[in-house]
From Swiss-Prot:
Originating organism: Arabidopsis thaliana
Chain intervals with Polar residues compositional bias: 1-18, 602-618
Motif (Nuclear localization signal): 269-283
Domain of life: Eukaryota
Compartments reported by the entry: Nucleus
Record protein name field: CRC domain-containing protein TSO1
Length: 695
């Protein structure tokens, strides 16, 4: 694992004396930024107050789902490494490094000699760390720790935005401060000695570094920015000019004028295995972590993120970053657990072009969160399908009611399917059903038998016309006869205002057939329908009464014409016309009167009146009296003034004509008048030629 192929072309010699770098302008600039006075380097061991332990061997080939613990963050002591400065071959540019060691104890400061010695050892190993061997593999699954190296340019960064050295100093100090998080136990176990660090070389590592999924905790954010620097020829040899990265290239290249906010975060692999409950892992990734990334320049697309060695649940999170339009520029492996602590050994991250970032720009940087709905999106699809199925079934149930018959075999009227004239289908939960097409003869025979007893059994409960709704809306108290129930409702407590009321459900008013109590149907009340029916009956009676009166008047006019113009076909005897008049008189008052018959004897002129009294309504008496009075008026005065005693002698057949017996009712007086009129008519016989030649 420790064998590494060193490339002499990529290594930078370390035999250059320190005095040469101390006189350089970059050294002077960095010394002005640092609050620590320069002293000579003394090799001392870097100490950590946290719990250190030897990492166990890598037994597992794939990481386990582990719980994510929040660790303590430490305030970094800003120091400048003045002992190691890299100069290009042509001497055109010099580049310096600001190495940020992390010490847990905030009250103690590491001496300058410790920092310089650590920087010397780290800088000498840079070519080995930056060069990844594509032949080795198998160890890309170990978690890594993150360290920050900020590269400073040889000149003060005043060319782009004109900021002074004091502004840069304040910006660097603000960016190198890592805010403290929640103090939770177990954070010290992530920090070990520098000798325990292992550099793994595999193509997966370079692929992971090429694709960055930058996730940090919502309560623990830090902001890092790079300052403008010049290119180094020996480093840029491995990087193509177009800014793309190869498979074996561990670092991604930032495009021009693109911010490097929170992107300079490298890492070395540490053999730390954490065996804890896997339940909290998903929750921490979804709830606690947020992605702070920069948007790509228009026209550029984010590279596909291939993170090696993560489980299926983390793959869902990694792939969801692409769907949420989060730009991916740098990459590092997030297998194992996401680190929240740092080690003293650092790995510099090189970029082709970097942009100066001030604290104000860092504060205005947008923060994007990973949506929770993107984790396991396939689970929502199944639930949506189930809901759609339920809604479809509910819609079918509402549109058509189905029966639940047990013993009637669906051949009774209370079976909704049978009463509606349809066959039972699948939604019905009936038992031993005969209401099916295979038993059509039985169904038809049963229907015919029920209709023979009740013809309206299968008739619709409500008969509605197009005008019924309009009529009901005009007057709520009136119910159109065309929209009334055939059977009627039987509501007791609902006042005909519920859906189970057949009248209310059909949109019609209650009728006389309804047996409801306290009806308040908005389409028509039961008492209102009674009034309408009574009014309609009165109107019918009035029309019938007028028609009958008109018919009586017409008969009176006809009788007048007969009297004024007697026909020549009548016999010479004066009695037949009057007898004809007397015979037709009962028909003049033929308005539902009990028949009062006048019998004319063959040999005698006697009249017989039945003993039964005549029951006549008051409305029917008046026209009869009017007719009789009019008839007496049209008689000649001679007949009115003639004596009654002569009737006996001059009767046609020499028979006595007995006057009618007076009755107690008014009809008796009417008949008496008729008898008097008849006597007067008989008295006028001498005016005609006598039938008896002897007289």
């Amino acid at each position: 694992m420790d064998k590494s192929q060193k490339n002499p072309t990529s290594q930078i010699g370390t035999s250059t004396p320190k005095s040469k770098f101390e006189d350089s302008p970059v050294f002077n600039y960095i010394s002005n930024l640092s609050p620590i006075e320069s002293v000579k380097s003394i090799s001392t061991a870097q100490t950590f107050s946290s719990l250190s332990f030897t990492s166990p061997p890598p037994v597992f080939t794939s990481p386990h789902v582990i719980s994510h613990r929040e660790s303590r963050f430490f305030r970094c002591h800003n120091s400048v490494d003045r002992s190691k400065h890299l100069e290009s071959l042509d001497g055109s540019a010099v580049k310096g490094e600001v190495v940020v060691p992390l010490v847990e104890d905030l009250n103690k400061e590491a001496s300058l000699e410790d920092e310089e010695e650590t920087s010397v050892e780290t800088s000498s190993e840079l070519p080995q760390i930056m060069k990844f061997d594509s032949q080795t593999s198998e160890h890309s699954d170990s978690p890594c720790t993150e360290d920050v190296v900020i590269e400073a340019s040889s000149d003060p960064p005043r060319g782009d935005n004109g900021s002074s050295s004091e502004d840069v100093t304040m910006g660097l100090q603000n960016m190198l401060v890592v805010r403290e998080g929640n103090d939770t136990p177990g954070c010290g176990r992530l920090i070990s000695d520098a000798t325990e660090l292992l550099v793994f070389r595999s193509p997966n590592d370079s692929e992971a570094f090429r694709c960055l999924v930058d996730k940090i905790s919502s309560s623990e954010r830090r902001f890092c920015a790079g300052v403008k620097s010049t290119k180094r020829p020996d480093i840029n040899k491995d990087i193509p000019a177009n800014g793309s990265s190869n498979e074996n290239q561990p670092l991604a290249v930032l495009p021009t004028n693109e911010s490097v906010f929170n992107l300079h975060r490298g890492g070395m692999r540490r053999r730390c295995l954490d065996f804890e409950m896997p339940g909290k892992r998903k929750k921490d990734i979804v709830d606690d972590q947020q992605s702070v990334c920069d948007n790509n320049v228009a026209g550029e697309s984010s590279s596909s993120c291939v993170v090696p060695g993560i489980g299926l649940h983390l793959n869902a999170v990694a792939m969801s970053a692409k769907d949420s339009n989060i730009s991916v520029i740098h990459g590092y492996s997030i297998s194992g657990e996401i680190q929240k602590s740092f080690s003293g050994s650092t790995t510099p991250i090189q970029s082709q072009d970097t942009v100066q970032e001030t604290s104000d720009q860092a504060e205005n940087e947008p923060v994007e969160e990973v949506p929770k709905a993107l984790v396991f999106p396939e689970l929502n699809l199944g639930s949506l399908k189930k809901k759609m199925r339920k809604s479809e079934q509910a819609g079918e149930g509402e549109s058509c009611k189905r029966c639940n018959c047990k013993k009637s075999k669906c051949l009774k009227l209370y079976c909704e399917c049978f009463a509606a004239g349809v066959y039972c289908i699948e939604p019905c939960s009936c038992i031993d059903c005969f209401n099916k097409p295979i038993h059509e003869e039985t169904v038809l025979a049963t229907r015919k038998q029920i209709e023979s007893r009740n013809p309206l059994a299968f008739a619709p409960k409500v008969i509605r016309n197009a005008d019924s709704i309009m009529e009901a809306s005009d007057d709520a108290s009136k119910t159109p006869a065309s929209a009334r129930h055939k059977r009627g409702c039987n509501c007791k407590k609902s006042n005909c205002m519920k859906k189970y009321c057949e009248c209310y459900q059909g949109g019609v008013g209650c009728s006389m057939n309804c047996r409801c109590e306290g009806c308040t149907n908005v389409f028509g009340r039961k008492d209102g329908s009674l009034l309408v029916i009574m009014e309609s009956k009165l109107e019918e009676n009035q029309e019938t009464y007028e028609k009958r009166i008109a018919k009586i008047q017409h008969n009176v006019e006809v009788s007048k014409e007969v009297e004024q113009n007697p026909s020549s076909d009548q016999p010479s005897t004066p009695l037949p016309p009057y007898r004809h008049l007397v015979v037709h008189q009962p028909f003049l008052s033929k308005n539902r009167l009990p028949p009062t018959q006048f019998f004319l004897g063959t040999g005698s002129s006697s009249f017989r009146k039945p003993n039964s009294d005549l029951a006549q309504s008051q409305n029917e008496k008046k026209p009869l009296e009017t007719v009789t009075e009019d008839k007496t008026e049209i008689m000649p005065e001679i007949l009115l003034n003639s004596p009654i005693a002569n009737i006996k002698a001059i009767s046609p057949n020499s028979k006595r004509v007995s006057p009618p017996q007076p009755g107690s009712s008014e009809s008796g007086s009417i008949l008496r008048r008729r008898g008097n009129g008849r006597k007067l008519i008989l008295r006028s016989i001498p005016a005609f030629p006598s039938l008896n030649p002897n007289q």
